[in-house]
Amino acid sequence: MEELTIWEQHTATLCRDPRRGFGIAISGGRDRASGSVVVSDVVPGGPADGRLQTGDHVVMVNGVSMESVTSTFAIQILKTCTKLANITVKRPRKIQLPATKAGTSGRGRQGLEEEADCGQGYDGDTSSGSGRSWDKRSRRARTGRRNQAGSRGRRSPGGNSEANGLALVSGFKRLPRQDVHMRPVKSVLVRRTESEEFGVTLGSQIFIKHITDSGLAARNRGLQEGDLILQINGVSSENLSLSDTRRLIEKSEGKLTLLVLRDRGQFLVNIPPAVSDSDSDSSFLDDISALGSELSQAVPSHVPPPPPHAQRSLDSDGTDSPRDSPPLRRENSLDSRTISEPDAPRHSSYDIYRVPSSQSAEDRGYSPDSRVVRFHKGTTIGLRLAGGNDVGIFVSGVQEGSPADGQGIQEGDQILQVNDVPFRNLTREEAVQFLVALPPGEEVELVTQRNEDIFRKMVQSRVGDSFYIRTHFELEASPPSGLGFTRGDVFHVLDTLCPGPGPSGARGTHWLAVRMGRDLREQERGIIPNQSRAEQLASLESAQRAVGAGPGASVGSSARAEFWRLRGLRRGAKKSTQRSREDLSALTRQGHYPPYERVVLREASFKRPVVILGPVADIAMQKLTAEMPDQFGIADSVLRTDSPSKIIKLDTVRVIAEKNKHALLDVTPSAVERLNYVQYYPIVVFCAPESRAALKALRQWLAPASRRSARRLYAQAQKLRKHSEHLFTATIPLRGTSDTWYQELKAVVREQQTRPIWTAEDQLDNSSEDNLELPHRGLADSSADLSCDSRVNSDYETDGEGYTDGEGYTDVDEGPPAPALARSSEPVLEEEPRSPRDHGRASGARGAQVDRHPYHSQGRQDSMRTYGQEALKKKFTRARDVESSDEDGYDWGPATDL
């Protein structure tokens, strides 16, 4: 008997356990001796017990290849799997072959190894104990076929193994041989009764059918015919028709980024004509595009995949793009085994929501078993809804005697569409609000599909809504379950119709959410206000800060000071009324953050700008550009055409990024807000001094010729930490007289550049009056700018009065006013934190920091402030009484009555 090692491929879907996680431990990787990611331990009784084994080689996790990756990357991928992990592993197995004659054993073994090679379906696997690579095995297989081409009719029994191949063992599947055409199989399904279902869910995937010799793809050599296209410019290609794909490519404007999966078997491009040619003489590619609207699982990107949620944007052309259906996983030609139970549904993070058209249900891509139900709405719909944007909207109950009763709607039906509005990507809250808003007596047309098995699994796994938001206002915690947050916090929303605090809490005012940490791990769970409630609270916060009563407002702030600050006036400057109106209009127009901003986790495709805040920012920028000029470049400032102040053009930042360099920016915190708004997402590093004396010693050691005031720099650093900490990517302490902080700074920039970041889900809509250009749209003609120092750079800066290290120390809030446009190392002492709703993110562009001028008597200002604070305090108290509750507990709402 001869012994041969083959590799079996298994796929298992694991549900995360709250205490045990996925129940596995992994080790190895490219940075280890083994080279492969291996399952090192399986927790008894965990989700993986009985499904995975110790020693399994991890091949793929949620569509992300684990071949030739580091162990850190593999662990990070598993951490980003919030609920489910679809893990594909390969497992070695030794089989015994009967001994063959000497003359045929070589050919027989070679044929067996060749068949095993063809059955792998992924790069880098070893199919025998030899450990030879795929390329070597491919060359060996091709050579073997050429040598044996003339003797196929005279094979011994051992030689027949090449023609017949290995039988399927333990669910092991082989990709079709490239030199053997598959024979088409015709299958006819006939329904005997109306209740019978075909039981087939179709899926599709865009692939590269042909590459022209004269195109860029042929010269780039990074693409091959047969490659599966997973993403086009960051948008998932799953379920996109050819027209949608063509439109997406046309919008790329000169730069096309494709994420592809290499099909080693060249299966799609080698389908025989009998299969690829349809009766209507359309190409095989057109056939696939017609089926591309069927539901299947999203294919994650090559980076840690963004969490599943839906993106909704209206397309002005009014075309309809079919949505995917929740339940089943796509059968990729590279998959080799399917488990018996269906995978939990997961939607792509880059779904496109189109305006519905007047097409029929079948034209929209719905399955043939979908049904259309029509009835007139009464006082209520009579349906109980469950699910959400992550799995779809399902019927969990029908009220007896309601208009929907008797129409054939059952528990477990998925609502695909209501009155030409697709429901596949709506949250449960949005679906309920849409149905409730329908006037009584109006005809309701529902397109439903029977998905009872998916509904049952959804209820058991307690999934529904799933998307991520970033907050842009502050809220205090309301025990026991209400979460507090500051600007910039990220939450994972799990239910958009969560009951309020206490057993009698009403639905419709709160979301169930989990706070996300800086390490992308989930933290505490609780409730937060829903979208409409958040808008009210954010408006109230803005009004409070306008009169100096809001969170974080400075002691010396007032309504009059806010009035002059919005007009971009600085001390001693005499601007015309027209100029002030233009500045205020620009601040209102250029940007506006919602209270909750939908975000996704993506990898930066460009070198992110670097903003260094703190008392050593000037020294750090000089050292970085001098030491690493090929990695860093200082963004030069230019004078305004209508004023002596200086600005930094966004086009300058773009040009530096195109050179594959980090743009070093000396800008104010308000300019950092603007950079985030235009989706540059800078790396903001704050250098925190220990004390004023330590800072003075450090600056004298780093820059002996510098005459900058250590007391002033220290006071400004304290102000930055107090009011702009939500902008910091990292904080580096300044200790002693060493360059440890500088080494940490370089390490932070390197690490943050490789980490995924929370980016806006929707692109910024540009106004025709706004010259702002986004990074992905090109900034060649941009006139957008950032605020920087408006004076000539000098080491000795007293701002018109004595301010040296020899002066006595005063409180940081009592320092003298600074000019309107200051560098990041010199923020305005009287500046108070403003939400993006207040300054429209463009305060850096117009210089919103100003001094307070005593145009009115102090008594009148105090009277105005006191009256405004008392009025708003009463309003805020009433709002907080509604928001908070002394009763404990919150509940996850699985369904909502209508």
UniProtKB/Swiss-Prot annotation:
Phosphorylated. InterPro entries: GK/Ca_channel_bsu, Guanylate_kin-like_dom, P-loop_NTPase, PDZ, PDZ_sf, SH3-like_dom_sf, SH3_domain, ZO. GO terms for cellular component: bicellular tight junction; cell surface; nucleus; plasma membrane; tight junction. The keyword Nucleotide-binding does not apply. Residues 569-750 form the Guanylate kinase-like domain. SMART domains: GuKc, PDZ. Residues 11-93, 187-264, 369-435 form the PDZ domain. Belongs to the MAGUK family. Heterodimer with TJP1. Interacts with UBN1. Interacts with occludin OCLN and claudins. Interacts with PATJ. Interacts with FASLG. Interacts with CCND1. This is Tight junction protein ZO-3. The keyword Disulfide bond does not apply. TJP1, TJP2, and TJP3 are closely related scaffolding proteins that link tight junction (TJ) transmembrane proteins such as claudins, junctional adhesion molecules, and occludin to the actin cytoskeleton. The tight junction acts to limit movement of substances through the paracellular space and as a boundary between the compositionally distinct apical and basolateral plasma membrane domains of epithelial and endothelial cells. Binds and recruits PATJ to tight junctions where it connects and stabilizes apical and lateral components of tight junctions. Keywords: Cell junction, Cell membrane, Membrane, Nucleus, Phosphoprotein, Repeat, SH3 domain, Tight junction.
